[in-house]
């Protein structure tokens, strides 16, 4: 648990190594996929966002990937954090890529992510924690 964390999309450990939410890149390289909901509705006001991305990359293959973190209702998302570098994030055993952003998030906010990659339909596992 992250100190001061209010809520997360992580539901505990998983036998298949997945954490958080799977986000899929577009079917064509360098195109964004659809928005995936990370948190449907934040339960309280938050002062920051921790983001951890894993599951991107395999040996001897380019796994460059960019991710947008957005807020807003389904179909009306607004990019909050653009082009976050998440490629080569490795497995959950490695630290993957972990970020903290000091952002004010209102109660009731939907938080989502989408990504684009040099590999069509590549995936990433995204964990998010809202901090007090």
Regions found by a protein language model. Give the residues of each.
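Beta-strand-centric surfaces of beta-sandwich/beta-rich domains
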Residues: 1-132
């Amino acid at each position: 648990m992250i100190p001061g964390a209010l809520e997360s999309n992580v539901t505990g450990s998983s036998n298949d190594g997945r954490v958080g939410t799977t986000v899929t890149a577009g079917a064509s390289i360098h195109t964004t996929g659809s928005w995936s909901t990370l948190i449907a509705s934040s339960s309280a006001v938050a002062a920051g966002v921790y983001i951890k991305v894993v599951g991107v990359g395999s040996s001897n293959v380019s796994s460059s990937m960019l991710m947008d973190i957005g807020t807003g209702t389904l179909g009306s998302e607004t990019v909050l954090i653009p082009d976050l570098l998440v490629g080569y994030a490795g497995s959950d055993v490695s630290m993957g890529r972990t970020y903290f952003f000091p952002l004010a998030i209102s109660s009731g906010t939907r938080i989502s992510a989408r990504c684009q990659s040099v590999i069509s339909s590549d995936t990433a596992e995204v964990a998010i924690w809202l901090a007090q």
